[in-house]
């Protein structure tokens, strides 16, 4: 029997419903194994903890690592050049970058800083945009899942910096080049999303749902459909769930000015 911390956070107004959704998914996966995956609860930073038991526990653990990612057990696991999955925290509260919680277990909370100058260079060709403009453009709000690559770690681990990983950067570039609006949903289960899309009559206007995390997703709008219109339809059905509009046109206008 082992207790694991998944790189998934539980948050929002309907935590019980979210826990049930995740447990249903995990039980469905483990039904064909000699293993049981039980959702225990969450850590102080809202990371989900599960208990894995049974003779197939190694298989189940590997699945959890591939599907969700497992939080580092200590600061010593963090190395320069290593890639990590995390969630944005305290978005917009500082002007010099974004902090990412990577789930590391430590006596004192340690988040990784992606500096403003790095975000400008990677996302906007060094255009001198404020952190708030960058956050709004790419919907980089609290709990947005972000994959980063460590670039600097202080000897005492008190300060850590990173840049966007190549995979994360490629994903963002693809979002822009595709040219389609997206609705970024932060804090809703797959069942909630499916219900809201059907109930609002938005099935024809949303061509695909891309999972960013178990409780986060990107709704890709069809050509000619704008994200704010979809948000107005979904808002009442996803009460309390943050919804953000991603507009490639807006980002391209920033890049055009930069050139």
Pin down the residues of each PLM region:
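OB-fold/S1-family RNA-binding modules
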Residues: 1-68, 131-259
